[in-house]
Amino acid sequence: MEVILLEKVRNLGNLGDKVHVKSGYGRNYLIPQNKAVFATEQNIELFEKRRAELEKKAQQNLANAEQRAAKLNDTTIVISAMASDEGKLYGSVGVNEIKDALIEKQIEISKREIVMPEGPLHSIGNYVVEVHVHSDVVANLQVEIIPAK
């Protein structure tokens, strides 16, 4: 299936690229999320007319993402969790706990944006967690896990 991307999609292409994707990915994700349209002659003409508007919107999204990243880079969250005397947690600190701690600080974020490639955190200490606020912008969030009293 051929589609035209209406915004930059990670590991796929940039705004305006005509790409070939599997039909399920196109129909079930890209098109419903308004990230792409079918690559018909009519849609290609419509896209060329709207290209400047879409590029301006993409620049605004990038600027907003950079502001959010700057705010997240300056943020340190402290999470209190039950732990043994050796510093091992009873359970773990994952994406949901980090998201909840950020919401308490009035920082809106989705679970999809938080990336923990090594999995949940299992011990007390200081960690750096990546937050992908945009396909081009990555923030580093400081997470401190302390033992609950």
Curated annotation (Swiss-Prot):
Disulfide linkage: none
Q: Which domain of life is it from?
A: Bacteria
Q: What Gene Ontology terms describe where this protein resides (cellular component)?
A: ribonucleoprotein complex; ribosome
Q: Which UniProt keywords apply?
A: Ribonucleoprotein, Ribosomal protein, RNA-binding, rRNA-binding
- Which Pfam families does this one have? Ribosomal_L9_C, Ribosomal_L9_N
Query: What InterPro entries has UniProt attached to this entry?
Result: Ribosomal_bL9, Ribosomal_bL9/RNase_H1_N, Ribosomal_bL9_bac/chp, Ribosomal_bL9_C, Ribosomal_bL9_C_sf, Ribosomal_bL9_N, Ribosomal_bL9_N_sf
KW RNA-binding (keyword) present: yes
Family membership noted in the UniProt record: Belongs to the bacterial ribosomal protein bL9 family.
Q: What does this protein do?
A: Binds to the 23S rRNA.
Cross-referenced NCBIfam families, in alphabetical order?
A: L9
Put simply, this protein is called Large ribosomal subunit protein bL9
Organism, by scientific name, is Legionella pneumophila (strain Lens)
Q: What gene makes this protein?
A: rplI
